């Protein structure tokens, strides 16, 4: 039984608008066009000595987070609360058990801990004075 010519096979398998492929079974199917993603408002991060620029940005509805040092947990939470009101409700609803357990400890126990994480919130010692484990003059 004679086999059909290769050109006849290609002619049958090729659909309108497609070019025949060099190898059978390797046809390229174009991807469907995708709808571009829509992004929510982006957070503008700036560091400016001019407070009028920062105030102007806030008036326009842009949240501005300024940090010149290592941000602590309170700083990060504050930025998150300003950006996402849903997150604020979730954080307020979260139980405060770890802090309550810490407050019940012996006051002398804090002196034995040498960790910067056991210290109070960064606001108590200044916003930008978070402890750093890198010695001066050395890079990460």
UniProtKB/Swiss-Prot annotation:
Q: Where on the chain is Phosphoserine found, per UniProt?
A: 21
Annotated keywords: Phosphoprotein
Q: Does the keyword field hold Signal?
A: no
Compositional bias (Low complexity) spans?
A: 118-127
Asked whether the UniProt record includes Phosphoprotein among its keywords, one would answer: yes
Q: What is this protein called?
A: FLYWCH family member 2
The taxonomic lineage of its organism, from the top, reads: Eukaryota, Metazoa, Chordata, Craniata, Vertebrata
Q: Which residue stretches belong to region Disordered?
A: 1-39, 83-140
**Species whose genome carries this gene:** Pongo abelii (Sumatran orangutan)
Please list the residue ranges that the record marks as compositionally biased, kind Basic and acidic residues: 98-114
Under the heading Pfam families, the entry gives: FLYWCH_N
């Amino acid at each position: 039984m004679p086999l059909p010519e290769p050109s006849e096979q290609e002619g049958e398998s090729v659909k309108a608008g497609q070019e025949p492929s060099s190898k059978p079974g390797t046809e390229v199917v174009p991807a469907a066009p995708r709808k571009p993603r829509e992004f929510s408002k982006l957070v503008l991060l700036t560091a400016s000595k001019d407070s009028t620029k920062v105030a102007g940005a806030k008036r326009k509805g842009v949240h501005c987070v300024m940090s010149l040092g290592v941000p602590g947990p309170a700083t990060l939470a504050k930025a998150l609360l300003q950006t996402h009101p849903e997150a604020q409700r979730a954080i307020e609803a979260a139980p405060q058990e770890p802090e309550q357990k810490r407050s019940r400890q012996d006051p002398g126990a804090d002196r034995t801990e040498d960790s910067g994480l056991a210290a109070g919130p960064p606001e108590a010692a200044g916003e930008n004075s978070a402890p750093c484990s890198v010695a001066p003059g050395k890079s990460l």
